[in-house]
Curated annotation (Swiss-Prot):
Miscellaneous comment text of the record: Present with 149 molecules/cell in log phase SD medium.
Extent of Polar residues compositional bias: 1-17, 267-279, 287-298, 305-323, 370-385, 610-629, 704-716, 781-793
Stretch list, region Disordered: 1-27, 188-217, 267-337, 370-398, 595-634, 681-804
Lyase found in the keyword field: no
Segment forming the signal sequence: none
Coiled coil spans: none
Entry-annotated residues carrying Phosphothreonine: T697, T817
The protein's name: Suppressor of mar1-1 protein
Keywords: Acetylation, DNA-binding, Nucleus, Phosphoprotein, Repressor, Sporulation, Transcription, Transcription regulation
GO molecular function: DNA replication origin binding; DNA-binding transcription repressor activity, RNA polymerase II-specific; RNA polymerase II cis-regulatory region sequence-specific DNA binding; sequence-specific DNA binding
Superkingdom classification of source: Eukaryota
Designated gene of the protein: SUM1
Residues that bear Phosphoserine: S378, S379, S628, S681, S712, S738
């Protein structure tokens, strides 16, 4: 400011010099004619100058206008002076210019000073606001810390209380122990006194250490001390001990990650992001400046925490100081698409750098030709290349977990001079790949990849050298790393399937197995990314919703139903209409079914152990089940109907003892009994059993096959029944009475019939042959134990009519004869037959068949079904006749599939297992699972029926069966990447989506469906039989761009050929 204040004084000085010019120029003026006039003018000029030049202190600060005005006033009144100035203007104008320049410069300086002051003021205000932001953020951090401190205080109080309870409990235990010890010491003291008196009286002592003299006094002291302790702890008796389940708060106690650490606002957050585990990647979008390490000794492990946030200096991010974010509860999210798999961790960076080093050292373009090939013979110029099969597989125990690639054997060089260099290169590659895999195994487990040198001696050595390829085989049934398992066809590789379903990729001749592995891994990654993107593009909006749904996300399902109320209402209306029409439609078959049921009872009395579906002679009461979530078709019965047998002549004499007033006239018999027989799943099973029994020959009775029910005319059945009535009338009367009477008569007969049945069952089961043709050596051994358990259970239940302990265990356990299987590379083998893997049908028969025979034998002596509690009534699913036939056919075809670990988690296996479980539940089995779970499993089978009916009616697939429905639903399950349990927990949602697809078949055809312009494969057409129907259906359901899905990439189950290990 001093410069600005002194500047005007200079201007004043300049202004004072301005009139001095005319004073000096008076002598140089030209002479005039009038000398007086000149003198007067000189005097006037002098007076004017004296008036125009005041003192320095009196001159005010003025701008340019004042100067101009003063100059004008000084020269305008004197024309002669102006003329003199025009004559000599140079000195005055130059002085004026200098003054003007100085004023202009000083004005500019003043403007610059004002602007700089304004900018500094603005910056100060901005800093103030930033400081306020920092203070606000620190305030929130301190509030969170205070909240943690309060929680710590609460937890500390609870722990102190629990510690007090434990001390009280301990004092009580010490008191009780001291009382017992006191009584024992008194007894010992009395005995010791008597023995010491005896010893002192005797002069001879026996062997052993002599007793101390102060033993009695020491024991007395101990007793007195214990008594004093008991008196002190008597008043501290506390509540009974309860376990403490409270843990101290961690760094993630209800505190958002954005508030957990202090971040300076001026720091760039993008450069400070830390990676999180994949299970909690959606919550890991936080930025950290500095994370001081604090270790809490909790559960014996050290974990990083966040106690101090004062440091601002960034800490280098290393794997040692990464924040250990706690994984959320529940199932971790699946890897949906490649776009969502973003990793920022340092181990991924190291792995990519190592992979880049491998690519730089082994360029893939130099290993592979630009064109696609199938078989490339090795040229004489490359004698080093030998076949290097790389086969990925896993052990049966699933315990193989490595951290580097292992070289099984070196490549044979056949005398090549470059062998030493080649081996050196292999060692370098193996070291680099080992480092890569060490980093990869920090985040996921990987299976071993063994590189072997194999010489295919198909002829002589010359032939072997001319047909040398590098073959990489990936096992289709092994649960290995998905990146390696998803190698598909691209421009550099030739892919094919061998007999075992393994994926074989042929490479051109390379110099080392490490090069082949690197090339295959690169191809796997690129192809997998492309296929994942392609799969995600082909999913519609609803399929993407199902893929991205969490397992128990019911809010999304409810919102979908709320937004599609019209669709839900139309679907339920159609289901109700079908339920009503199905009863009327099936009434014409009811009398026929009733006749068959009566005759089947006669046959089952003669042959109590047939191979079809078993009858259930227990009385049932009819009611319809209703479960929540709209998951049932509605026609599944909760309780089975009472059995009613009516003779052809209309005689109802033996049915007078039946309850609920079912003795009706012959005119009303057809309608009422028809509904009862339709609601009775037991009689449908009896129909199946009788049809199987008549078609069997004596030589086929020992094989376990499931022949579908053949349609027979009602007239033929009545004619056969009339012909057989004369010979079997007495037995018909005995079988038509109520189960309660029959149980009473059997009880009066004693143990004879039961013993005969036991012998018959043992003889039959001893020759049972499973589906795969293997005779079980253990099944007949376990049959006698089953029969003995049944007899003991029956003996315990005959006295009071209630279920005893043996019956409870019998109805709860499914496997009376456990099966010991060996798992090897995803296949299951019996211990007595370790060469041939077991089939699914054989496994299920081993699991359920013995229980079925046991339930058949024990059902006669069980109590009435109506007397059971509601919890015990686990109702069987009702099969309509056509559904029953198609289900048995599907079971017959699918039972030939080899059992694998992946097949157990499929809908096909669910169908086969549900068929067995439903049969046993109809016989009175109580499953270990809850009733709600069983209802949902029944609803899933009802979903198959729903899709089958919709496909027949709206998709115009007239030969569509349950087998087609299950295969297509399995394809749909793979397409949306969901589990079987997810299916029967989202029945209504799936029904709505499938119902809408069937309403718009022409516009909404999906990739997982059967082709709409082709004929469905069925038995009897184009040479299709039961042996090749399953594979034919699988061939129609393969995706164009994938094998059978993204996450479930595997060979179709029908094409799996187990390896021959013999």
């Amino acid at each position: 400011m001093s410069e600005n204040t002194t500047a005007p004084s200079d201007n004043i000085t300049n202004e004072q010099r301005l009139p001095s010019g005319p004073k000096d120029d008076v002598d140089t003026l030209a002479l005039t004619s009038a000398q007086n006039q000149a003198n007067s003018l000189r005097k006037l000029d002098t007076d004017a100058n004296a008036k125009a030049l005041p003192s320095i202190t009196d001159i005010p600060v003025s701008d340019d206008s004042d100067i101009k005005r003063q100059v004008g006033s000084g020269f305008g009144s004197n024309p002669l002076h102006i003329k003199d100035s025009e004559a000599f203007p140079h000195s005055s104008i130059e002085a004026l210019k200098e003054g003007m320049d100085k004023v202009t410069k000083q004005c500019n300086d003043l403007k610059t000073a004002l602007l700089s002051k304004d900018t500094s003021l603005t910056d100060s205000v901005q800093d103030l606001f930033n400081s306020l932001k920092v203070l606000s953020h620190n305030q929130s951090v301190l509030e969170n810390k205070l909240d943690d401190v309060m929680k710590n205080q609460v937890n500390t109080d609870i722990l102190v209380n629990n510690l007090n309870e434990r001390l009280n409990k301990l004092s009580t235990m010490l008191q009780n122990t001291s009382k017992v010890n006191h009584s024992n010491l008194l007894i010992e003291n009395s005995s010791n006194n008597t023995s010491s008196q005896h010893n002192t009286s005797s002069s001879r002592r026996g062997p052993g250490r002599p007793r101390k003299d102060a033993s009695t006094s020491t024991m007395n002291k101990l007793v007195s001390n214990a008594a004093s302790v008991n008196l002190k702890s008597a008043s501290n008796q506390g509540a009974p001990f309860s376990p403490v389940n409270i843990t101290l708060p961690t760094a993630v106690v209800q505190t958002s990650k954005s508030k957990r650490y202090f971040v300076e606002p001026s720091t760039k957050q993008e450069s400070l992001l830390l990676s999180a585990p994949s299970s909690s990647r959606d919550d890991a979008d936080m930025s950290l400046t500095s994370v001081p390490q604090r270790t809490n000794n909790e559960n014996g492990k050290e974990r990083p925490s966040t106690a101090n946030s004062s440091s601002i200096t960034p800490t280098p991010v290393t794997p040692n100081n990464l924040i250990q974010i706690k994984r959320k509860r529940g199932r971790p999210p699946k890897k949906r698409t490649v776009e969502t798999m973003i990793s920022n961790s340092t181990d991924t960076i190291d792995k990519s750098d190592a992979s880049n080093r491998i690519k730089n050292e082994i360029p893939i373009n130099s290993l592979l030709p630009s064109s696609k090939f199938h078989q490339i013979p090795s040229s004489p110029s490359n004698p080093v290349s030998q076949p290097a099969p790389v086969r990925t597989s896993r052990s049966a125990t699933q315990e193989i977990d490595i951290k580097s690639l292992e070289l099984a054997s070196l490549i044979s060089t056949n005398g090549d001079p470059n062998a030493e260099d080649s081996n050196t290169t292999d060692t370098v590659h193996n070291n680099v790949e080992g480092k890569v895999n060490v980093e990869e195994n920090k985040t996921e487990k990987e299976k071993i990849i063994t590189i072997k040198s194999s010489s295919e001696n198909s002829g002589n050595n010359t032939t072997n050298n001319n047909n040398t390829d590098n073959v990489i085989k990936f096992s289709a049934n092994s649960d290995i790393n998905s990146d390696i398992r998803r190698l598909m066809v691209n421009d550099q590789f030739s892919l094919s399937y061998d007999a075992s379903g393994n994926i074989t990729v042929k490479l051109p001749p390379v110099s080392s197995p490490a090069a082949a592995t690197a090339a295959a891994a690169a191809a796997v990654t690129s192809e997998m990314n492309r296929q994942q993107r392609e799969l995600d593009k082909r999913r519609d909006s609803r399929e993407k919703m199902l893929v991205n749904m969490k397992y128990n996300d019911r809010d999304k399902a409810k919102s979908f139903m709320e937004s599609n109320k019209k669709l839900l209402k139309a679907m339920k209306e159609e289901e109700r209409r079908k339920r009503m029409t199905s009863i009327i439609h099936d009434n014409h078959l009811n009398l026929n079914l009733n006749e068959i049921s009566t005759r089947s009872k006669i046959k089952s009395a003669e042959k109590p152990t047939t191979k079809g579906s078993s009858m259930s002679p227990k009385p049932r009461s009819a009611s319809i089940s209703g479960i929540s979530d709209h998951q049932q078709e509605g026609y599944q019965p909760l309780e089975q109907e009472k059995l009613v047998d009516i003779d052809n002549e209309g005689s109802n004499a033996n049915s007078d003892s039946l309850k609920m007033g079912l003795t009706i006239s012959a005119a009303d018999t057809v309608h009422k009994v028809g509904i009862q027989s339709m609601l009775n799943s037991g009689e449908e099973a009896i129909t199946k059993e009788n049809a199987e029994y008549e078609r069997k020959t004596p030589g086929d009775e020992e094989t376990t096959t499931f022949v579908p029910l053949e349609n027979s005319q009602p007239s033929d059945t009545i004619r056969k029944r009339t012909a057989g009535d004369d010979g079997a009338l007495d037995q018909t009367e005995n079988t038509s009475i109520s189960p309660k009477k029959r149980r009473t008569e059997d009880h009066t007969k004693g143990e004879e019939d039961e013993g005969e049945r036991g012998v018959g069952n043992s003889g039959t089961l001893a020759t049972v042959e499973n589906v795969s043709g293997d005779i079980s050596a253990d099944l007949s051994k376990g049959t006698s134990s089953i029969h003995n358990d049944t007899e003991s259970a029956n003996d315990s239940s005959n006295g009071n009519g209630n279920l005893g302990l043996g019956t409870e265990s019998r109805n709860t356990l499914l496997t009376a004869t456990p099966i010991e299987l060996i798992c090897r590379e995803g296949f299951f083998y019996r211990r007595d037959i370790p060469d041939v893997p077991i089939t699914t049908g054989a496994y299920l028969e081993f699991k359920f068949k013995a229980k079925e025979e046991e339930l058949i034998n024990s059902s006669i002596n069980e109590e009435d079904y109506a007397a059971k509690s509601k919890h015990e009534k686990m109702n069987a699913h009702f099969f309509k006749p056509d559904i029953q036939e198609e289900t048995e056919l599907a079971f017959e075809i699918l039972s030939k599939t080899t059992l694998t670990e992946k097949y157990v988690n499929s809908l096909e296996y669910f169908l086969m297992e549900f068929r067995w479980e439903n049969k046993l539940v109809g016989l009175g089995l109580k499953l270990r699972e809850s009733k709600r779970t069983w209802q949902r499993r029944k609803a899933l089978f009802a979903l198959f029926e729903f899709w089958r009916d919709q496909s027949r009616d709206k998709r115009r697939f007239h030969n569509y069966t349950i087998l087609h429905a299950v295969k297509e639903m399995e394809n749909y399950r793979i397409f949306i990447n969901r589990s079987v349990s997810w299916f029967y927990n989202h029945i209504t949602l799936l029904k709505m989506i499938l119902y809408d697809l069937c309403d718009n078949v022409t516009t909404q055809w999906r990739e997982w469906m059967f082709p709409h312009n082709e004929t469905l494969p069925a038995l009897g057409q184009d040479g299709i039989n039961e042996d090749n129907l399953n594979e034919t259906i699988d061939n129609m359901l393969i995706f164009d761009f994938l094998d059978d899905g993204s996450e479930n990439n595997q060979v179709k189950y029908s094409r799996i050929i187990p390896p021959d290990i013999r």
